[in-house]
Structure formats: structure tokens, C-alpha cells
Amino acid sequence: MDLKYLNQKEAIDVDQELFTEYKFSVDQLMELAGLSCAHAVAKCFPAEKHPRILVCCGPGNNGGDGLVAARHLSLMGYTPTIYYPKPTAKPLFENLSHQCQMMGICGVKECPSVESAAANYDLILDALFGFSFKPPVRADFVAVVELMQQTKLPIASVDIPSGWDVEKGKLTECDVEPALLISLTAPKLCARQFRGEHHYLGGRFVPPALQRKYELNLPVYPGNELCVKL
């Protein structure tokens, strides 16, 4: 059976069912998702060669995954720096930000230029927009999306490369081209267009009954791994 790629409605339905039928909390799944993202980054971009990571966080759950990933990456020997242009005013996100601050993780207020990013970072973690994103990109995030479109640094995208349509994928030739895509729960339709070197699945929390209901046909995670190469 082939791995299923979810459309936007299916992705939302699976997410909601995890919360309602299976009684997972948002912070539970966010912690597991962000941790799996950190593991995928560590597999593809070892800290010895890519120690400095600019973590770009958006306003929703995708940004929360980025905050979690930054915290775990700091424990794995990386030096993450967070760019979070529009922090979400909810306790969960405020707590995640506070945890990063207490871990000594720095943040930047202004989006770095292409030149500044090249000088100060080895990798960009793109945690801006998730599967609820609908184009166009809002004003607060135009600068950081343009940075990712123009940079020569490798990019690791969380679930959806920023600016891509969740189902159609790239909308223009200058859209973000990540080297690593970490699909969460199950890959979305846009991932069929991914041409980068590394595609991983993370979020090892999907109950078998839910997998069967949606015919996800997820690959088997090896051993005790938190992510699996697709």
C-alpha cells in the first residue's frame, strides 16, 4: 500500500480527531512534533558542521513546533537563534518562549539580511506556516520568506515549506526550496513536489486505529527512532 499524502481537509480532520477522540493535548503533540524535527535536523545536518541555526517561527502551531525544536537542538549541541516576528499571546506559546529564554537561547528582533544570515548561521529552520496556511504571505512575514527564497544556506522546513500551497505546492519558481522537509503526522499533498535531498516523517504518535481509518499507510519507524526517512 502506498503512503497517503493528505489534502488540507484531511490534515485538519486527523489533527482534530487526535484532540477530540484520542484526548491528546496541543502541547503534548507539539512537544513530540518539535522533538522529532530536532532529531531529523541532527540526522541531516550534524552539529559539528551546522552548529548555528536561525529558527524562524510563525504565529501558529508550526511556530510552536519551531520553539520546541530550538530547545531540543540547544541540548544537542547546536546554537539556535530564534526569529519570532509575531509571538502568539497564548499561555502555551508564552511558556515555550520562556523555556527557550531560560535555556539561554537568544532571539533577534529584526529579520537578518541575506548577507547577515550567511555570516552568522549555518542552517535555517523554517517553522513559519503549517497546513492551515492560505496565500498570500502576510506583511509581518514577507521579509523572512524573502530571506529564505534568496539565501544559499540550507533550509529545513517543518511540515510545509513556507509560502507553498498545502495541496499544490510551489506557486512560483522563486518559492522556498528546502534541503530537508520534515512532514509531521503524515505528509501533505505539497510534499509530492519536494525535490530536496532529505524527506523525513516525524510525529510518532498516530494511533494504529487512526492510521487505519484514514488509510495513511505510514512507514514503520525503525527501533526507537522519532523520525523515519521517506
Swiss-Prot record:
Reactions that this protein is recorded to catalyse: (6R)-NADHX = (6S)-NADHX; (6R)-NADPHX = (6S)-NADPHX
Signal peptide range: none
SUPFAM superfamilies linked to this entry: YjeF N-terminal domain-like
Annotated transmembrane regions: none
Protein name as catalogued: NAD(P)H-hydrate epimerase
Cofactor: K(+)
Binding site for (6S)-NADPHX: 61-65, 130-136, 159
Binding site for K(+): 62, 126, 162
Biological function: Catalyzes the epimerization of the S- and R-forms of NAD(P)HX, a damaged form of NAD(P)H that is a result of enzymatic or heat-dependent hydration. This is a prerequisite for the S-specific NAD(P)H-hydrate dehydratase to allow the repair of both epimers of NAD(P)HX.
Cofactor remark: Binds 1 potassium ion per subunit.
Keyword check for Lipoprotein: no
Span of domain YjeF N-terminal: 11-218
Keyword presence, NAD: yes
A single GO cellular-component term on record: mitochondrion
One Pfam family linked to the record: YjeF_N
InterPro entries given in the database record: YjeF_N_dom, YjeF_N_dom_sf, YJEFN_prot_NAXE-like
Annotated organism of origin: Drosophila erecta (Fruit fly)
Keywords recorded for this protein, A-Z: Isomerase, Metal-binding, NAD, NADP, Nucleotide-binding, Potassium
Family of the protein in this entry: Belongs to the NnrE/AIBP family.
Listed EC numbers: 5.1.99.6
GO molecular function, one term: nucleotide binding
